[in-house]
Amino acid sequence: RAKVDSYPAYEKYGIVFAFLGDLPENERCDAYEIEEFEADGWRANEVITIDIDYNYERSVENGLDPAHNEFVHPTHGFEGAKNDYKVNPTQITDTAWGANFAQVFDAPPLDADTYGESARKESGNLTVYGGYHGPNTLITQIHTQKETGWFHQYFFEQPIDEFQTRIYFVNMRNWLMDEAMDETIMERNLIIAHQDIDVMKNLRPFVTPASMTKEILLPADAIIGKYRSTLKEFDKKGFKIDVRTLKNQEHHTAYAIPSPARRTEKNWVLDPIPLLTPD
């Protein structure tokens, strides 16, 4: 009998995740594990979605970029006022499906009107941890103080096509625990997100160049270079759609992303979608 594909799916953090591919379960990249989710001493905002009109890889790179705060976010840097401002070296650690980093920033104090009297009152070192998991999960963990004042943010970025992305945003914190603070904190997060969007929507080229020699990467871009190298390794494994071939055939052929059952069963109605192959 003729068959159509179906895919493994599950719910986590209030988000439905579906694995689109034919890998067996023990070889897949699972959804990132948020260790503090539902843990004592932590509070999660309601998950929100953000639709952006640019490529998901560009979006992830922007979130990883340790240099952009000084130029894009007025509350995160000094807006060029410090002539000796510099980006400190990034400490990068490999993971099974990506990389983590640790970064020390020279950062201004937090706004007491927004974050209250417990917010840090002086400029100085601020530690940010983060990284990426798989091709499209961004992790940002901001520690404004040693034991508290922590914001942990997780962005699950769903590619719609080359030029559109839907982001599912999970925001965790271990301070300002009153439910009444949820709206204020998310409003602040969305202001920051739209500062990024205003810059990124005009970035050219829309899609990350195939070669890193086609854009200037500086020492501060080390984690971005690492992310691009990881994506290249995924491409070699056949994890990425060949968009050019797909577009050439889109009016003549309907394709399906292969499901796990294709490895053991036959008689599929639709051809498998074209994938990039190693050079």
Predicted regions and their residues:
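Tryptophan-centered motif/residue detector
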Residues: 17-19, 42
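Active-site-proximal cofactor/substrate-binding loop regions of enzyme domains
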Residues: 1-17
